């Protein structure tokens, strides 16, 4: 599954702290079994088990352990959760929605221009949406402001 993700839009970020360093406010990215196995080919001891078959990347001092020298050291194999951010999928009243977190770091219109790429990715991940949406690791994210972009029909 090829998706460059949204990180390319963050290159002009004016924040002194990168989102990969804000896990006191954000939740550590979720990773699937497949992502865990892929990363495990190169690294060990990098995840915590959240639920059966659902894992999160470890953090140290609120920073992703793969964020080194202002770069992602696993960029080419980074988890889907990282590729999607600041988009996310939430469940409300038994419906699923694509949302965009309101970031104060850049103009959200830049992210809205990525909708074709994101919609294509959403189609590919539909089989796993129910497994990964609104799990217990969503607790910090629920306090973040967001806009609902569209309903996702599963």
Regions found by a protein language model. Give the residues of each.
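Short loop/turn segments that flank or connect secondary-structure elements
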Residues: 1-154
């Amino acid at each position: 599954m090829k998706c460059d993700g949204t990180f390319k839009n963050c290159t002009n970020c004016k924040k002194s702290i990168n989102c990969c360093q804000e896990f006191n406010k954000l939740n550590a990215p979720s990773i699937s079994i497949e992502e865990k196995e892929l990363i495990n080919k190169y690294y060990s001891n990098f995840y915590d088990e959240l639920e059966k078959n659902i894992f999160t990347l470890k953090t140290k001092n609120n920073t992703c352990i793969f964020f080194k020298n202002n770069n992602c050291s696993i960029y080419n194999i980074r988890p889907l959760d990282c590729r999607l951010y600041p988009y996310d999928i939430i469940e409300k009243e038994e419906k699923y929605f694509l949302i965009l977190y309101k970031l104060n770091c850049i103009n959200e219109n830049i992210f809205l221009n990525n909708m074709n790429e994101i919609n294509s990715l959403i189609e590919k991940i539909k089989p796993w949406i129910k497994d990964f949406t609104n799990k217990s690791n969503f607790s910090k994210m629920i306090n973040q402001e967001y806009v609902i972009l569209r309903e996702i029909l599963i």
